Amino acid sequence: TNYGGYKGKIRVIDALSTAAFDYPRRRTFFKKQLEEFFLLSREENFDVMRIRGSYAGAMGFAQFMPDNYRKLALDFDEDGKKDILNNAADAIGSVANFLASDAGNKRGWEEDGFIALPAKAKKKNVKIKSSFGLKPYNKLDIFYNQTDFDFPKQYIQISLFPDDETKDEFWIGDKNLYAITRYNPSSKYAMSVFLLSEELKITSDL
């Protein structure tokens, strides 16, 4: 959404009803979302004809589908409304709630867990495919550990991202990285968010 600058221009009711009745492959999913949208609109006093979002019916800063809006959106600033459409504070709190929930990860976000660690292959030109989102990759003995963190002993989700320039620099991601991808299923998105968060820590003294 370009940090909330573009949240979509399609009426959510149009997007969901079109997909629910004219898209057989995902009909069950979108019929459920249409029902959730009507329930959400009643609960939050929305005008169903005015709410706009993405082509798939996702809404607001966080681009939540209606079911996740109902289950996971928070009134983070405690003003009496769960507003991820226009309220950045509510949106940020709601995304954090998503990551900590079963939707984000079967075990939820681990507050003290790492997201991704830099690692260097012990041999040059090592051929390793990214294991992102697939089976845990447990051959970590081929890497040098370049951080103060220990590589995890039990792998929930391990992802390897070769550096495009050096080819022998890797990032090893654990289940917190995987949780980010449950919000957006792009490995590049997840790594971008992680690296941006690290820069924010530096500049804001977090």
Regions found by a protein language model. Name each.
Residues N2, T18-T28, I51-A58, D77-N86, ...:
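Second-shell loop/turn segments in exported
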Residues R11, A15, F29-E36, G60, ...:
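Extracytoplasmic/secreted proteins, especially bacterial periplasmic and envelope-associated proteins
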Residues F29, Q33, E43, Y55:
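Catalytic cores of secreted/periplasmic lytic hydrolases that degrade extracellular macromolecules
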Residues Q146, K153-L206:
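C-terminal functional modules
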Residues A19-A20, S41, L72, L99-D102, ...:
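Generic structural signal for hydrophobic core residues of well-folded globular domains
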Residues V48, Y55-E165:
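Flexible, glycine-rich surface segments
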Residues T1-R11, F21-R27, E43-M49, Q63, ...:
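Secretory-pathway/luminal and periplasmic proteins that interact with or process carbohydrate-rich
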Residues T1-G4, F37-R42, V95-N97:
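Short, functionally critical alpha-helical segments immediately adjacent to catalytic or ligand/cofactor-binding
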